[in-house]
């Protein structure tokens, strides 16, 4: 059988622990037998990041900007315990944070729907994609404790030397806490364009929600920028694609989403997206059944699983014990990247392969073959659940793929 050829390389970012093991198995069993895989490889494993003083992460991010499509394995973001465990030179920053900073991207997370794994919200029959703005707000805040009798103010020092002072609160009767947070027009504009472009790419309605009735300057700025960019650049494109852009308040959005059948992109500010993405993931089944793609406003895509490195299973693996680690999200990271590479290069054969592998993965589960984490939540009349170990599950997917 002739392997599928690739004309443009895919940026491949390897990772850590159990997901690194699955990464190699996926390539061996599901990809290289069928594709003449063309990747520009970067080892983002923690030891290699340390060896290169994290230069490899920056190189991978800029390669993604150059080639337009990347696939990333889950990686360790070191804390103090990891610094000691790996004898690191320093506590390196999150690789995801570095890639986001270079691409100025927005993270889109979407559940993988399987017949037999029901959403906890019965009406949710189609995926809900969460688009989370990954910059600023409370995640880049400054905050302090305030003594009784103190007064808190915002001071804005103008470039002309003038200062604008706004009182936040006079803590005359009690001590308390205060924080300051920010965002930038540039970042909000990038967020908006990423959301509009992705909605056009996947042909889904886009919802955006803030609390502009209460936050009449901060949240209203988000609303205005989205509205201005939509009307100036995307209104006609959305109409041609048969999709809609819809703005509402965040509390109304929550109520609408719960009542909906799904099938939309829900764009959220940073904190809202952090909370709602976990809520949606849990309601649909698990983080191991969520896709994640980082999209830059200039059209670069980085695909990855929405979960971590599965440390507990990795330590079992090192002891020679059997593991049953869910690889579905990592498989879909590969298929998402291959599909996008195929679309950009006009390589229909590669695109069709990726779609077929996704269908084979879902069909394998629907036929009763799955990892142990899914076994307890899968219920389908006439289907017997047969839990598989990590590699056995991938072998079953290959068997399904070959018989399709």
Where are these regions (language model features)?
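N-terminal glycine-rich phosphate/adenylate-binding segment common to multiple enzyme folds
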Residues: 47-164, 271-275
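Glycine-rich phosphate/diphosphate-binding loop of Rossmann-like nucleotide-binding domains
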Residues: 6-25, 154-248
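N-terminal small/polar loop signature for handling phosphorylated ligands or for N-terminal nucleophile
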Residues: 46-60, 223-264
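Glycine-rich phosphate/nucleotide-binding loop
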Residues: 257-356, 363-367
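Internal helix-turn-beta structural module
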Residues: 319-325, 343-404
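Flexible, glycine/charged-enriched surface loops at secondary-structure junctions
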Residues: 35-41, 202-210, 234-247, 342-354, ...
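N-terminal alpha-helical transmembrane segments of multi-pass membrane transport
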Residues: 2-8, 18, 22-23, 28-52, ...
């Amino acid at each position: 059988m002739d392997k599928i050829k690739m004309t443009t390389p895919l940026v491949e970012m390897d990772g850590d622990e159990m997901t690194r093991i699955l990464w190699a198995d996926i390539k061996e069993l599901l990809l290289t037998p069928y594709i003449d895989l063309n990747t520009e490889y970067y080892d983002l494993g923690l030891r290699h990041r340390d060896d290169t003083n994290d230069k490899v992460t920056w190189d991978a991010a800029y390669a993604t900007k150059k080639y337009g499509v990347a696939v990333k394995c889950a990686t360790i973001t070191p804390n103090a315990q990891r610094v000691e465990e790996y004898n690191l030179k320093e506590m390196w920053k999150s690789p995801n944070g570095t890639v986001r900073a270079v691409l100025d991207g927005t993270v889109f997370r979407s559940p993988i729907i399987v017949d037999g794994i029901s959403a906890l919200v019965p009406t949710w029959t189609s995926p809900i994609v969460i688009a989370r703005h990954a910059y600023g707000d409370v995640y880049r805040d400054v905050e302090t404790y305030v003594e009784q009798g103190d007064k808190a103010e915002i001071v804005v020092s103008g470039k002309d030397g003038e200062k604008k002072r706004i009182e936040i609160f006079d803590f005359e009767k009690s001590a308390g806490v205060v924080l300051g947070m920010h965002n930038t027009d540039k970042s909000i504009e990038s967020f908006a364009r990423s959301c509009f472009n992705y909605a056009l790419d996947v042909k889904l309605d886009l919802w955006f929600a803030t609390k502009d009735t209460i936050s009449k300057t901060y949240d209203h700025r988000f609303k205005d920028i989205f509205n201005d960019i939509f009307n100036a650049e995307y209104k006609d494109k959305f109409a041609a694609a048969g999709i809609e852009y819809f703005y509402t308040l965040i509390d109304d959005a929550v109520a609408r989403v719960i009542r909906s059948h799904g099938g939309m992109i829900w764009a959220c500010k940073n904190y809202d997206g952090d909370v709602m993405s976990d809520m949606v993931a849990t309601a649909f089944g698990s983080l191991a059944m969520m896709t994640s793609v980082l999209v830059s406003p200039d059209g670069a895509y980085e695909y990855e699983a929405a979960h971590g490195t599965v440390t507990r299973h990795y330590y079992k693996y090192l002891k020679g014990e059997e593991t049953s680690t869910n690889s579905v999200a990592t498989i879909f990271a590969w298929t998402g990247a291959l599909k996008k590479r195929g679309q950009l290069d006009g390589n229909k054969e590669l695109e069709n392969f990726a779609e077929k592998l996704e269908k084979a993965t879902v069909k394998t589960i629907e036929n009763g073959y799955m990892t142990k984490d899914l076994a307890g939540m899968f219920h389908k009349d006439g289907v017997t659940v047969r839990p598989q170990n990590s590699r056995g599950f991938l072998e079953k997917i290959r068997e399904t793929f070959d018989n399709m």
